[in-house]
Structure formats: structure tokens, C-alpha cells
Curated annotation (Swiss-Prot):
Known role: Inhibits sodium channel (Nav) inactivation. Shows two types of inhibitory activities on channels. Inhibition of insect DmNav1/para and hNav1.6/SCN8A shows a large increase in the steady-state current component without any increase in the slow component, whereas inhibition of hNav1.1/SCN1A, hNav1.2/SCN2A, hNav1.3/SCN3A and hNav1.7/SCN9A shows a large increase in the slow component with only a small steady-state component. Is 5-fold more potent than alpha-PMTX for inducing repetitive action potentials in lobster neuromuscular junctions.
Note: Does not inactivate (neither slow nor steady-state components) hNav1.4/SCN4A and hNav1.5/SCN5A sodium channels, although some very small inhibitory effects are seen for the hNav1.5/SCN5A isoform.
Organism classification: Eukaryota, Metazoa, Ecdysozoa, Arthropoda, Hexapoda
One of the record's GO cellular component terms: host cell presynaptic membrane
Protein name, as recorded: Beta-pompilidotoxin
Molecular functions per Gene Ontology: sodium channel regulator activity; toxin activity
Residues bearing PTM Leucine amide: 13
Length: 13
């Protein structure tokens, strides 16, 4: 999924 990738980056912050 692409939406998950976006959330993954936010979680890294």
C-alpha cells in the first residue's frame, strides 16, 4: 500500500 508508506515516514519522525 502507498498510504502506509506515508504513515511510516511520519512515524519515523
Amino acid at each position: 500500500r502507498i498510504k502506509i508508506g506515508l504513515f511510516d515516514q511520519l512515524s519515523r519522525l
